[in-house]
Amino acid sequence: WTIMAGFRLYLACLRLCCACRFDLAGLDRLRGAGPLIVAANHPSLLDVVLIASRLPDAVCVIKAALFDRLLFGAAARLAGYIRNDAPLEMVLQARAELRDGAQLVIFPEGSRTAVFPVDAFAPGAALIAWRAAMPVQTVLIDYSSPYLGKAWPLFRRPALPLTCHVRLGRRFPPPADYAVFSSELEAYFRAELGQNTPSTATIGS
């Protein structure tokens, strides 16, 4: 709850000071839904904050490098987040968290999107779903700008207001074959996001 409250406060500051608009109501439908895997696309640095701000039982799988950052790393360890650099340990920790009732948030691309709509998926999300026998709830994140994406210069301001819409997609049952499911999951995201990707033309404007 402490992490969720902190993320909500941060988003409130972005709304107030930076004219950002976030439509996150769809995520509220997952509260109380019990343990499951939340698989989302990853266009921006804000994605973890957006999802975890609405889900009190969220445990996120994040890049190992983030644990080395002073403030975020401390918060990640406090929240019990999982590093993605040791596949076997990641799967075992994720399965244990799910069995304890957590909602596991994972970005199957493994890092922020470089080539929209999504980069190739790593097998981690599918492998966890298979080993833990858990359903996978897809979450689709759309921004009005590629701000804080991989291609966006860190100190370049976006056009305001920045808007973000987070919607629930299909919920997949526990997979019988993780390799087949990983391909199916990637194809689903490509189909759903293909017409709703932020234009990189705004980067040079």
Identify the residue ranges that each predicted region occupies.
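Membrane-interfacial terminal anchoring regions of lipid-handling membrane enzymes
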Residues: W1-A5, D28-R31, R99, S144, ...
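Catalytic core of membrane glycerolipid acyltransferases/transacylases, capturing the structured
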Residues: W1-G6, L16-C17, G32-A86
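Short gly/ser/thr-rich secondary-structure transition/capping motifs
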Residues: L16-A25, D85-L88, L148-A151
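Residue-level preference for the first positions of well-ordered beta-strands
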Residues: P35-I37, G101-F107
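Short glycine-rich anion-binding loops that position phosphate/pyrophosphate groups of nucleotides
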Residues: H42-S44, E109-T113
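A cross-family acyltransferase "interaction/gating" segment
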Residues: L71-G73, R99-Q103, A114-E184
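Short acidic active-site motifs
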Residues: M90-A94, D177
